[in-house]
Amino acid sequence: MSKNKSNKCSGIVVALKANYLFVEINAQKLNFFTSDISLNKSRLLCTRRSKLDYQGLFIDVGDEVLLESIDWVNKTAVVSDLCPRKSFLKRPAVANVTLIAICVSVEQPLLDAEQASRFLITAEGSNIKPLLVLTKIDLITKENLNFYRDRFKLWGYDCLGVSLKNKQGIELIIDQFRQTKLSVLAGPSGVGKTSLINYLIPTLSLPISSVSKKLKRGIHTTRHVELFSLGN
């Protein structure tokens, strides 16, 4: 065997592009959350054994997989098997999620409690711990913020209030992400998910769309699911 190749090892699928998978070795030891463009990290470009298709095994972002025929020079490998999943979120399709941060804005667009409840139900139904994040809290009074917190507390959920304008609550949400293995940001369009990701990882520079003045809601900009390391 070539010294540039090794036997089997495991890794986590961080992105899917056409018929290829990007797998990060030992990624299970890092912290991740999802977004929609490449960070150009050192990853292995992988194909998959046809037997997985015959067995009806579908691989999604977040899946832990076994690799073989690894070429470290060219950074390629073959996915030979899929490890058991601990959880699965259907939309976006992400496996092994341990925390879903559900972002809802208190203004621009106005908080929609019914919409928030649908995201919470999805998280609970997927056996994933939900974290409710209230964004743009600089646009409302402290009294209104406490009203929303009390309302969601009656539902059984504590809230984190976040404002990128005055940096309020940012460290708290970072601590939540670092305490778990794989986190997902979810929520309606226009609530500030992309802005939050750009703040946490400035090198990404993800495109941001403004809230429609006519429709009073955000414009959907997500293209695909990808995992990124939050770092230290």
PLM features per residue range, with description:
Residues 13, 62, 177, 196, ...:
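Conserved RecA-like P-loop NTPase ATPase core
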Residues 51, 86, 203-232:
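Switch I (effector-binding) loop of TRAFAC-class P-loop GTPase G-domains
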Residues 78, 88-160:
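Conserved C-terminal guanine-recognition region of P-loop GTPase G domains, centered on the G4
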Residues 139-191:
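Canonical P-loop GTPase G-domain recognition
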Residues 185, 198-202, 208:
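Conserved ATP-binding TGD loop and adjacent catalytic N/P-domain core of P-type ATPases
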Residues 189, 194-195, 199:
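Walker A/P-loop
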